[in-house]
């Protein structure tokens, strides 16, 4: 399908099928479509409303081009789309560390900040973790600790090709949606936070098509109803659960899990150094109750998605124990020490 045909289809307001979208993305990544046409395609996809098939097709193309890394089917990713402008600290990163200490295998795919002061890569780097480990080093780290951080630019070098077009457009495109779906370890278990409720069904279907075995797609609200791309302890959380190809929907509030409701201002983040200190204090047992419960809630969902907990309530108990016994702090210290040793042995992925 030539790019002129793709443009004709999109200009008519029609959707691309999954195979058509895959061929389109293949052509973009192969340099077979000029930048001006790429810009038009991305704009029209956004204008028409991106479909689950289009997301699934684009994902398939990009995953095939990712630098491969093999972990195992137990691995869980905790990530969000970003874009909520709420300015919270790195809740999903803190949750990943707590869940890992509670026995959950974590393969966290992340990047530097786009809409906030501090992304997952920023805060982990500030905590002392080498974020650009060679894939062999990351695999070894995962085998020893059950934790891996997969730095997106390292595993998706082909994405550089569209960076200038995306920057010149200055709008959200399908690439902003694809991030949480592009874990190079091809994880089968995910907690995905989305900033816009209309994206929930799209993610659920795209994850189903990718072979995901268990995922929770969550959209939170602040106390005033503003959007959050994570499970909320400030208001309601809307959830779509995907398990064994079946989806169900429900809405929760913090008190359903014996958590308090906190103002979103109590979860404010800052610079990478400030957020790293906040997470350290959280793992030391010195954070505020609001910060603690926000991280516990997300960690509990990760425990549930992993299969280690039978429900979110049980996950909260597991996460609380990991914090109370300082296991999460000791675990982070071990991850940092081992990863530095492995960096010396294998070098970085840029080598």
Swiss-Prot record:
Annotated Pfam families: Glycos_trans_3N, Glycos_transf_3
GO MF annotation list: anthranilate phosphoribosyltransferase activity; magnesium ion binding
Cofactor note: Binds 2 magnesium ions per monomer.
Gene Ontology, cellular component aspect: cytosol
Keyword list, A-Z: Amino-acid biosynthesis, Aromatic amino acid biosynthesis, Glycosyltransferase, Magnesium, Metal-binding, Transferase, Tryptophan biosynthesis
InterPro entries membership: Anthranilate_Pribosyl_Tfrase, Glycosyl_Trfase_fam3, Glycosyl_Trfase_fam3_N_dom, Glycosyl_Trfase_fam3_N_dom_sf, Nuc_phospho_transferase
Catalytic activity, EC: 2.4.2.18
Pathway: Amino-acid biosynthesis; L-tryptophan biosynthesis; L-tryptophan from chorismate: step 2/5
Coiled-coil annotated spans: none
Binding, anthranilate 1: 80, 111
Residues binding 5-phospho-alpha-D-ribose 1-diphosphate: 80, 83-84, 88, 90-93, 108-116, 120
Record field: catalytic activity: N-(5-phospho-beta-D-ribosyl)anthranilate + diphosphate = 5-phospho-alpha-D-ribose 1-diphosphate + anthranilate
Binding site for Mg(2+) 1: 92, 230
Family, as annotated: Belongs to the anthranilate phosphoribosyltransferase family.
Assembly notes: Homodimer.
Job description of the protein: Catalyzes the transfer of the phosphoribosyl group of 5-phosphorylribose-1-pyrophosphate (PRPP) to anthranilate to yield N-(5'-phosphoribosyl)-anthranilate (PRA).
Name of the featured protein: Anthranilate phosphoribosyltransferase
Species the sequence originates in: Chlorobium phaeovibrioides (strain DSM 265 / 1930) (Prosthecochloris vibrioformis (strain DSM 265))
């Amino acid at each position: 399908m030539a790019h002129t045909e793709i443009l004709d289809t999109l200009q008519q307001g029609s959707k691309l099928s999954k195979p058509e979208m895959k061929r389109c993305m293949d052509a973009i990544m192969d340099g077979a479509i000029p930048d001006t046409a790429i810009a038009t395609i991305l704009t029209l996809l956004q204008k028409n409303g991106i479909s689950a098939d289009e997301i699934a097709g684009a994902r398939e193309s990009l995953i095939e081009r990712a630098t491969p890394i093999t972990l195992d089917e137990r691995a869980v990713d905790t990530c969000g789309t970003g874009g909520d402008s709420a300015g919270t600290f790195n809740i999903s990163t803190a949750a990943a560390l707590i869940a890992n200490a509670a026995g959950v295998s974590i393969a966290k795919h992340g990047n530097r900040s786009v809409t906030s002061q501090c992304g997952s890569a920023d805060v982990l780097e500030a905590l002392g973790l080498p974020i650009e480990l060679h894939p062999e080093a990351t695999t070894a780290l995962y085998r020893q600790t059950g934790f891996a951080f997969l730095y997106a630019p390292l595993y998706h070098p082909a994405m550089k090709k569209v960076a200038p077009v995306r920057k010149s457009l200055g709008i959200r495109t399908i690439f902003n949606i694809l991030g949480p779906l592009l874990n190079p370890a091809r994880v089968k278990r995910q907690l995905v936070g989305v900033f816009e409720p209309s994206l929930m069904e799209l993610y659920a279907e795209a994850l189903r098509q990718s072979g995901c075995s268990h995922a929770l797609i969550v959209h939170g609200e602040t106390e005033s109803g503003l959007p959050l791309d994570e499970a909320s302890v400030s208001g309601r959380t809307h959830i779509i659960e995907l398990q064994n190809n079946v989806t169900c929907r429900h809405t929760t509030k913090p008190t359903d899990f014996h958590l308090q409701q906190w103002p979103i201002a109590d979860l404010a983040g800052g610079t990478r150094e400030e957020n790293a200190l906040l997470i350290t204090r959280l793992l030391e047992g010195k954070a505020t109750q609001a910060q603690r419960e926000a991280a516990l809630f997300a960690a509990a969902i990760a425990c549930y998605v992993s299969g280690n907990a039978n429900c979110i309530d049980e996950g909260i108990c597991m996460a609380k124990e990991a914090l109370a016994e300082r296991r999460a702090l000791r675990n982070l210290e071990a991850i940092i020490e081992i990863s530095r040793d492995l960096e010396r042995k294998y070098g970085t992925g840029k080598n």
